[in-house]
């Protein structure tokens, strides 16, 4: 059975990265008159699409649980990958009277939520993996009193990934890999939240004894659809493997799906991100490339936020930041992890996690 180091705290929420596809659509598992039924109604507006087998899919799974367990109703609006349509899509979603809570995530949605929250003061807004400005100096004219936002200390989990990566490649522990002491990290685009992954990863790589300047290859998908371009992700990963990388870690939403394809072709390895991608990937060969996944468990975070919201204890008008100490981020310890990572190294990673939690190790951040 998978033992997953994942979220707990009621103050947790998360998210990063737009999915694939381009057309806007909506789905609902609630009746159109759900407002009359007395159910609390969540509208999940995605600046992208479901199907990334990572971040947004995790969020959706958590929100679906609220229907069964907490009596919420859920409507999902997928805005697609065309950024020029996101502003109007959020306007349309917020203008409807078919929700009590509008949930959205990533840095790209901050301006939308900041504008809409004061316009709809009787509604609640959840923003994950980014935070609005609560001072009133910019953004929300009402100081975002009806907005709850949460950021994650992804740098702490990335530190563990970097530590593990260096130890694996230095020991030449991954079967069939060249053992050149190199790894790759593919980000979606160079923004603070992605840079936080990079900074943490390099710090962990260095702490394990590696040289991040020569041992960590970093590249960004970029373009018009940085978090929804699997073809570009495959191209970048293939180039990294050709440069001698034993493994590549995609931090780029569904662009990362191309990395798993490339890993199979190159007979190399990967780390997953945001969800347990050993579990969510459907291709058996791709699954075997996933040594571990570094988690921001959006689904559990949203579920816990919904639980607190229903109880009247969710703190609006402020933001929270959660990391390893709060079980806000973590890593997957499953059968594939046990198979590919020697027991002594598994113990070292656990020890490093404990040091970060206790404050004995302070991980640098891009923020």
Where are these regions (language model features)?
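Bacterial lipoprotein signal-peptidase II cleavage site
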Residues: 20-31
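Bacterial N-terminal signal peptides that target proteins for export
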Residues: 1-8
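A residue-level marker of the well-folded mature domains of exported/periplasmic proteins
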Residues: 30-367
């Amino acid at each position: 059975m998978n033992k997953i180091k994942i979220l707990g705290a009621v103050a947790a929420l998360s998210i990063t990265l737009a999915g694939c596809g381009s057309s806007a659509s909506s789905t609902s598992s609630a009746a159109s008159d759900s407002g009359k039924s007395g159910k609390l109604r969540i509208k999940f507006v995605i600046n992208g699409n479901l199907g990334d087998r990572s971040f947004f899919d995790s969020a959706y799974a958590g929100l679906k649980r609220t229907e069964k367990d907490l009596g919420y109703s859920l409507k999902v609006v997928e805005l697609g990958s065309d950024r020029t349509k996101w502003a109007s899509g959020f306007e349309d979603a917020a203008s409807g009277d078919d929700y009590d809570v509008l949930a959205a995530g990533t840095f790209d949605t901050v301006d939308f939520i900041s504008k809409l929250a004061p316009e709809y003061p009787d509604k609640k807004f959840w923003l994950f993996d980014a935070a609005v400005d609560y001072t009133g100096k910019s953004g929300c004219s009402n100081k975002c009193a009806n907005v709850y936002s949460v950021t994650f200390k992804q740098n702490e989990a990335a530190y563990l990934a970097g530590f593990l990566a260096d130890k694996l490649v230095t020991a030449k522990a991954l079967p069939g890999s060249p053992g050149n002491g190199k790894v790759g990290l593919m980000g979606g685009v160079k923004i603070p939240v992605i840079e936080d992954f990079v900074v943490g990863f390099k710090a962990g790589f260095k702490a394990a004894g590696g040289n991040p300047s020569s041992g960590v290859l970093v590249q960004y998908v970029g373009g018009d659809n940085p978090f929804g371009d699997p073809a570009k992700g495959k191209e970048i990963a293939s180039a990294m493997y050709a440069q001698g990388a034993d493994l590549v870690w995609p931090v780029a939403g569904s662009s990362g799906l191309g990395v798993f394809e490339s890993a199979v072709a190159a007979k190399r390895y990967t780390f997953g991100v945001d969800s347990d991608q050993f579990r969510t990937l459907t291709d058996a060969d791709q699954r075997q490339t996933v040594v571990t996944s570094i988690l921001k468990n959006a689904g559990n975070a949203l579920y816990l936020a919904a639980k607190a919201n229903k109880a009247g204890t969710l703190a609006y008008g402020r933001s929270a930041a959660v990391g390893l100490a709060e079980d806000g981020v973590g890593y997957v310890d499953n059968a594939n992890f046990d198979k590919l990572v020697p027991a002594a190294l598994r113990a070292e990673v656990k020890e490093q996690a404990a040091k970060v939690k206790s404050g004995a190790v302070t991980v640098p951040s891009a923020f």
